[in-house]
Amino acid sequence: MIRVLHITGSMNRGGIETFIMNIYRNMDREKVQFDFLLWTDKKCDYTDEILRLGSKIYNISPRRKGIINNIKELINFFSKHKEYRIVHQHVNSLSYITPLKIAKKNNVPIRIIHGHNIQVGGHPLNQYLHRFNKLSIRKIATDFFACSELAAKWLYPTKQYLAGDYKIIKNAIDIDSFTYSETVRNKIRNELNIQDKLVIGHIGRVSYQK
């Protein structure tokens, strides 16, 4: 069996996390298994399901509690867990690719970077780190994924983007969960007392991408 180590901040009900889970639930887990390295010290929304499906979850200190401890724990993790031959880091920017850098130093042969966004948010330092790491990402990762052409163009160096040295991985969704049901429609409208009203709903962040 192949075990792939997915690296991300948490496994709550965000876009990246739900994308991973949609794939995980529907793949052949007798051939490939996902494990998770998370920089959080809290139980996540998907924790119980992940463990039930046969995964291992490893937790390291969040960066907000000290980047030094975060790096030390990453070094310790990869020095102990030599069994992983594939690591797959999910990112919104290149501001934090330390896990991939340390994986490379520990000779992990397949190191995937997977972009899920088209801009850097938060502190201006993140913008600087994104631009800085963009200069070396081709030396750090071995495989380059993005959720769209725009994400690839923004995430990877111009020369790499123009050469087409990346793969577009479209976000998978479980379409059965969104199939129209008259029964469900009427049930929810009755519960919310909105039988004869036009309802427009939005469950995402009110941001440019949405």
Feature locations, PLM:
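Membrane-interface segments of envelope glycosyltransferases acting on lipid-linked substrates or membrane lipids
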Residues: M1-K210
